[in-house]
Amino acid sequence: MPELPEVETVRKGLEKRLKNFYIDNVEVLSERSIASNGGSNVFIFNLKDLVFGRWSRRGKYLIASLCKESDLIEEIPSGTLVVHLRMTGYFEWHQNTKAPCTHTRVRFWNKKGSEIRFIDIRNFGQMWWIPPNKLPSEVINGLKNLGPEPFSKDFNPEYLKYCLKGRKRSIKSSLLDQSILAGVGNIYADESLFEAGITPIKASGDLNGCELKKLCKSLTRILKASIGKGGTTFSDFRDLEGLNGTYGGYAWVYRRNQKPCRKCGTLIEKTKVAGRSTHWCPNCQN
């Protein structure tokens, strides 16, 4: 599943390509992709003739402000579009429209015939139209329950200490909990724990003050590094222009089972933690 760096990469692409994009037409090819009330008919009716404003991100959710063309300057809202890519969702930009591929789920056109296309092989991705009198978090439970962003002032060693105090579950499991920290998934949990020198199976409540500081620093550093490389592509993820993320080629441990550690040469091991494949160095993370 795309994590924070991948979703942020998509957000940047959408912000660049869809600035003042007038939604002249919408086609929904998969009813399953529309999660908001009323299904595709209500979704299309409410988005048509609006303009995409700013794109933001909350955890793994993409959030676009929508307004009427006449309200662009003052940015008077006419609703919000929220997107979750789930496992295999991504967007493609087409300057000139052409026949969609089999896995195309939703299409948006502007007046010039240019198109933004949502493609999702496994068809788990979701879109919501949120009316202007509602906050997205009032409609989408996943948004309402998110913890702080890793780059926010609310995320710090003191916050982690408070959240993890007395917890027996593994620190890897806690990092995957979106109610504790928004946007981190399997890839960057493994990478951050390696850089912090913490074994993924250690009980969350057993981390000392020094380890908590290291973990906070490694999380933000690893996430920033991945954003700088366009995220990670191991299967379906790509940016708006169809380019793959390149962080995977620089990963410390993720998907490097039985390869030498980039720091000490010990073979990277793979195990299951909280039901998820977990990569770690038994020497550096002892």
UniProtKB/Swiss-Prot annotation:
It catalyses: Hydrolysis of DNA containing ring-opened 7-methylguanine residues, releasing 2,6-diamino-4-hydroxy-5-(N-methyl)formamidopyrimidine; 2'-deoxyribonucleotide-(2'-deoxyribose 5'-phosphate)-2'-deoxyribonucleotide-DNA = a 3'-end 2'-deoxyribonucleotide-(2,3-dehydro-2,3-deoxyribose 5'-phosphate)-DNA + a 5'-end 5'-phospho-2'-deoxyribonucleoside-DNA + H(+). Its cofactor is Zn(2+). Its EC number is 3.2.2.23, 4.2.99.18. Binds 1 zinc ion per subunit. InterPro entries: DNA_glyclase/AP_lyase_DNA-bd (IPR015886), DNA_glyclase_Znf_dom_DNA_BS (IPR015887), Formamido-pyr_DNA_Glyclase (IPR020629), FPG_cat (IPR012319), MutM-like_N-ter (IPR035937), Ribosomal_uS13-like_H2TH (IPR010979), Znf_DNA_glyclase/AP_lyase (IPR000214), Znf_FPG/IleRS (IPR010663). CDD domains: EcFpg-like_N. It comes from the Bacteria. GO terms for biological process: base-excision repair. Monomer. NCBIfam families: fpg, PRK01103.1, PRK13945.1. Belongs to the FPG family. HAMAP family: Fapy_DNA_glycosyl. This is Formamidopyrimidine-DNA glycosylase. The gene is mutM.
